[in-house]
Amino acid sequence: MSSAYELVSNYQPAGDQPQAIKTLNEGLENGLAHQTLLGVTGSGKTFTLANVIAHSGRPTIIMAHNKTLAAQLYGEMKAFFPNNAVEYFVSYFDYYQPEAYVPTTDTFIEKDSSVNEHIEQMRLSATKALLERKDAIIIASVSAIYGLGDPKAYLSMILHLRRGDIINQRDMLRRLAELQYKRNDMAFERGTFRVRGEVLDIFPAESEHEAIRIEMFDDEVERISKFDPLTGSIITKDMPRCTIYPKTHYVTPREQVLDAIEKIKVDLAIRQKELLENNKLVEEQRITQRTQFDIEMMNELGFCSGIENYSRYLSGRPEGEAPPTLFDYLPQDGLLIIDESHITVSQIGAMYKGDRSRKENLVEYGFRLPSALDNRPLRFEEFEALAPQTIYVSATPGKYEIEKSDGEIAEQVVRPTGLLDPVIEVRPVATQVDDLLSEIRIRTKNNERVLVTTLTKRMAEDLTEYLDEHGVKVRYLHSDIDTVERVEIIRDLRLGEFDVLVGINLLREGLDMPEVSLVAILDADKEGFLRSERSLIQTIGRAARNLEGKAILYADKITGSMEKAIGETERRREKQQLHNETLGIVPQALKKDVADILELGDMTKNKRKVVAPKIKLSEVAEEGASYSAMSPQQLEKAIQKLESKMYQHAKDLEFEQAAQVRDEIDNLRKQFIVNS
């Protein structure tokens, strides 16, 4: 079967990978709606999925439960498919304060947000890839279930230009303005155009390093070319055609806006009557004033602040209908993969209710029309109805995934490296701290690392202090630490800056540390969320990448969760040992460069034809890395300053210096995603 994908890898499927790939491919070909890949830590689940995607040849959305994991997957998939469209679709807000009203204190909180332009460009690039290509892999967060512009309206606004077309230049500029592009003859940046005589330059909103040049001869399109907006060098000369996509997903034709205004007026009159009948005079005055102001803005400018609350009218949807989302851009033969499904599935289910309760207050107290309730994420049942063929991926699949898969579970227990699951020991609670200290000393002599998980913040702090007093190099990882500092701490642990990391609920999914040979779980017999079967298996799995991996559970009794977790780990270990003995495999230690923890994939790879001098990325926790400790807001300001500097160099014809600054900006943008 020929595929649109080209999988690039030095490895061949090994261990349980070939069987898992075969099972999943057969399931897809047989039309199974739901399948589950049960893959243990370090078994190469991403490589298995890459093989399944390559074999299927279908456009794919991979959903992750947070931006950090999404960025990690983006980097891995980008490495496997360097010649295909691997895109990144997460929330583009650096900061977002939603509109809200607190009745008890009569406090109205205005919407406040800060949009990251680079991520907005990547989102536009993602939807463009889905609309244009079969070989599109979109790495998305739960942002994918939130309302996006209607794909029909979006497609209807696209500007197609062909060589030889007869079109008046002013008409072309008017069309660009409708797509929300702005004219800027001085600073040529994303989402703008400039005019020089009969030459029109357009910087597409979804592009990072390529702009379009339209050369006219009177009213005829004489030549279309693609060029580097920084240096001006031609990338592709004399193209037969080009397509200009809108600057935003939320663009709407003028006729639809005018039609929406009439519908808003009708609903406003109905709402005014309801409020007056219930003697809510303040609320009636409030909704009248706010809505009429919005109508005036839409009439004059085509949009208003908070226009998303009128999305139902703009897209022509009936009341209560699901909003258009990223899934509406996915072709019918698309594929959905949900990573760490035991968390992501429940996260998808939780989004709707939290959003609904906040909006109900706004509607009840006259800040918004009832139509605002339809600007929402998908309900879980709507998500289920929209989702194409789905593969759930987890080391500990939840009840939902197992039921949906109806026994269609591909097991990936045997690792290609031959590494075994950790040995598990249960020891008494009474001497847990002293026993732990002696175990730590054994590990530090062998230059190995230790993870310790406690039940409470207080205990984690006390234990950290106690170990520190006894000469142990220890750090404490807690929920107040932001993403970038967390990555920095993990990197320092791997480098040996300290030997023991103490935490509560942060030592589970997505931590890849081959140096960790011991995981200690204190108070393992206290049943609850942090000591459930799934949590225990995930935590024990942190020691599964080391040859000497061991997990010690401190408990006075064996709980049901402990029994199941120990039983499952031993079952996997036996299967792994049998496989190694049968094939004569000697377990190999996993070697992974410490720098790899921060790799997000080269976001500009294969997008740029112009070769420029390389500038080293300022990696998080790197000595002297001035940008690594910055907040996303500070990084955004630094990027803006560098962009001004870059344009000044270009203006002064200092193209080498401009290219160097451009590369530094690219690196900062990668840093930005880590820090977000």
UniProtKB/Swiss-Prot annotation:
Q: Where is the Helicase C-terminal domain?
A: 432-598
Give the SMART domains listed for this entry: DEXDc, HELICc
Signal sequence segment? none
Per its UniProt record, what SUPFAM superfamilies does this chain match?
A: C-terminal UvrC-binding domain of UvrB (SSF46600), P-loop containing nucleoside triphosphate hydrolases (SSF52540)
User: What Pfam families does its record include?
Assistant: Helicase_C, ResIII, UVR, UvrB, UvrB_inter
**Residue ranges annotated for the Helicase ATP-binding domain, each copy included:** 26-414
Q: Which is one GO molecular function term here?
A: ATP hydrolysis activity
**Which Gene Ontology terms of cellular component type are present?**
cytoplasm; excinuclease repair complex
Where the record places motif Beta-hairpin is 92-115
Where does it live in the cell? Cytoplasm
**In what residue span(s) does the UVR domain sit?**
636-671
Query: Its principal location?
Result: cytoplasm
Extract the InterPro entries matched here. Answer: Helicase/UvrB_N, Helicase_ATP-bd, Helicase_C-like, P-loop_NTPase, UVR_dom, UVR_dom_sf, UvrB, UvrB_inter
What is one process in the GO biological process aspect for this record? nucleotide-excision repair
Binding positions for ATP per the UniProt entry:
G39, V40, T41, G42, S43, G44, K45, T46
The highest taxon in the source lineage is Bacteria
Q: Report the family membership.
A: Belongs to the UvrB family.
Give the matching PANTHER family.
UVRABC SYSTEM PROTEIN B
Q: What does this protein do?
A: The UvrABC repair system catalyzes the recognition and processing of DNA lesions. A damage recognition complex composed of 2 UvrA and 2 UvrB subunits scans DNA for abnormalities. Upon binding of the UvrA(2)B(2) complex to a putative damaged site, the DNA wraps around one UvrB monomer. DNA wrap is dependent on ATP binding by UvrB and probably causes local melting of the DNA helix, facilitating insertion of UvrB beta-hairpin between the DNA strands. Then UvrB probes one DNA strand for the presence of a lesion.
Any domain commentary? The beta-hairpin motif is involved in DNA binding.
Tell me, how does this one assemble? Answer: Forms a heterotetramer with UvrA during the search for lesions. Interacts with UvrC in an incision complex.
Which protein is depicted?
UvrABC system protein B
Q: Which organism is it from?
A: Aliivibrio fischeri (strain ATCC 700601 / ES114)
